[in-house]
């Protein structure tokens, strides 16, 4: 078992032991675990390390090549020499060897030079791609974390609705038995209860998916009770810089995806030059030294020590059209890389604009939802009084309560949407880092579990429920039967 797997197992066991003590996995804790345990990020690390070797591979074509070769063998031959005196035969049985040390250095090799520049561009592309994947990990952790908490808020809201509708249903039944209500009131309340139950089930499915995604990132089993909830004192930070133009310019200059595609254009351009180099001559310097004994029949029983130095020139004349076709193919690929870059620039700027609008409007949106919640809560209380006075009917109360819970759900969603939009804005601008995640993490309450801390439409709020048990389902059915 590797040390990394051992630490992951120990952390999972630690969570299981402390789960009942309301242990909270903070947002930063989750990110630090993801750095070590997320398979996608670990694969990105290895890809980056492999990509860094492109520079050395390209440079190797410009450096000298030193080769040593040695050959030793034994030969047997029958030699017949024809002279004026007749034929003479000789049997030869001898050892031979050839030892050579050679050095080659390119002097003019445009293909090697293009390959070197392409290798540098490929290494830079790998750096930028890894920078993008590093920032993306921050976003993935945040979105999985907030997705699970948002689903928990929706579960608790659905439970609050069910409790309210259950009480209203019981009231409708009593009034119907006394002759003060109608069967329609009971059916309306039952329909709203069933809808809230369906919403709770849907929220639980969403929460389970978010938790499984977070587990995949951190490499340890998690439950919603392990996460630190959103605090009461939620603040919307003013954007810095404040203008969209500044964020646009920042994205064009710093976005790692755009930077990697610019390097991809360079790689494609040097690929064209590398293929075009096959039209050009090559000039190289060579030097060698060698020793041999009986290296051939002509040097039988002779020893040689040979040193040589010179230049070698090769000029391509005709390759059957291969060079021209390869150059054209590389040119089309280069043009494609330009269009890929243009498309990514437009997509990135659209996302920057979208995240900028969401971030800059979040403060007003959250304030509006807070006012909506207050107004809806007041409407619920007023509607109850109106029903008691005989002015309103049961459906009016159900609609008022539905509006209240809908506003509370939108308020919760707006807060989480702001956090992810703010982080994604910095991600698309290419400046997202761990310090930004620390600012986001300050909105969560460490050491607590995600229990509901919001006002309810009733004075007695239902306690948080972490699992939907069979008993709960049976109780829900019995309340409506």
Curated annotation (Swiss-Prot):
Keywords: Cell outer membrane, Membrane, Transmembrane, Transmembrane beta strand, Transport. Residues 462-481 are annotated as: Disordered. It comes from the Bacteria. One of its GO terms (molecular function) is porin activity. One of its GO terms (biological process) is secretion. Its main location: membrane. It is found in: Cell outer membrane. Involved in the secretion of alkaline protease. NCBIfam families: type_I_sec_TolC (TIGR01844). This is Alkaline protease secretion protein AprF. The lineage of its organism: Bacteria, Pseudomonadati, Pseudomonadota, Gammaproteobacteria, Pseudomonadales.
């Amino acid at each position: 078992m590797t040390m990394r797997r051992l630490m992951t197992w120990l952390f999972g066991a630690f969570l299981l032991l402390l789960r009942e003590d309301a242990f909270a996995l903070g947002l930063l804790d989750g990110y630090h675990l993801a750095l070590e345990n997320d398979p996608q990020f670990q694969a990105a690390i290895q890809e980056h390390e492999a990509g860094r070797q492109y520079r050395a591979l390209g440079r190797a074509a410009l450096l000298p090549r030193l080769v040593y070769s040695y050959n030793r063998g034994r030969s047997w031959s029958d030699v017949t020499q024809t002279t004026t005196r007749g034929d003479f035969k000789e049997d030869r049985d001898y050892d031979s060897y050839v030892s050579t040390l050679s050095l080659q250095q390119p002097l003019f090799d445009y293909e090697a030079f293009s390959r070197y520049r392409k290798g540098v561009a490929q290494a830079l592309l790998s750096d930028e791609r890894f920078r993008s994947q590093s920032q993306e990990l921050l976003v993935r952790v945040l979105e999985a974390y907030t997705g699970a908490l948002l689903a928990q808020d929706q579960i608790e809201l659905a439970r609050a609705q069910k409790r309210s509708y259950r009480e209203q249903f019981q009231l409708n039944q009593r009034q119907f038995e006394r002759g003060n209500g109608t069967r329609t009131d009971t059916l309306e309340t039952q329909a709203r209860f069933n809808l809230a139950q369906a919403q709770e089930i849907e929220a639980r499915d969403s929460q389970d998916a978010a938790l499984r995604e977070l587990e995949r990132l951190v490499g340890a089993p998690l439950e919603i009770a392990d996460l630190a909830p959103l605090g009461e004192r939620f603040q919307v930070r003013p954007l810095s810089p404040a203008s969209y133009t500044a964020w646009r310019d920042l994205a064009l200059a710093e976005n790692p995806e755009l930077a990697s595609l610019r390097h991809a254009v360079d790689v494609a351009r040097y690929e064209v030059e590398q293929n075009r180099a096959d039209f050009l001559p090559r000039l190289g310097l060579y030097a060698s030294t060698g020793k041999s004994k009986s290296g051939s029949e002509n040097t039988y029983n002779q020893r040689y020590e040979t040193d040589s130095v010179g230049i070698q020139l090769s000029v391509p004349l005709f390759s059957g059209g291969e060079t021209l076709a390869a150059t054209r193919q590389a040119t089309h690929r280069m043009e494609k890389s330009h269009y890929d870059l243009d498309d990514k620039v437009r997509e990135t700027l659209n996302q920057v604009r979208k995240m900028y609008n969401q971030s800059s409007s979040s403060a007003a949106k959250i304030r509006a939802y807070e006012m909506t919640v207050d107004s809806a809560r007041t409407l619920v209380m007023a509607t109850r009084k109106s029903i008691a006075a005989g002015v309103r009917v049961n459906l009016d109360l159900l609609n008022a309560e539905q509006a209240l819970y809908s506003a509370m759900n939108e308020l919760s969603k707006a807060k989480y949407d702001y956090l992810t939009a703010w982080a994604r804005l910095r991600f698309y601008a290419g400046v997202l880092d761990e310090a930004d995640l620390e600012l986001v993490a300050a909105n969560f309450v460490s050491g607590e579990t995600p229990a509901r801390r919001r006002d309810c439409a009733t004075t007695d709020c239902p306690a948080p429920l972490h699992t939907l048990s069979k008993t709960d389902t049976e109780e829900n059915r019995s309340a409506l039967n």
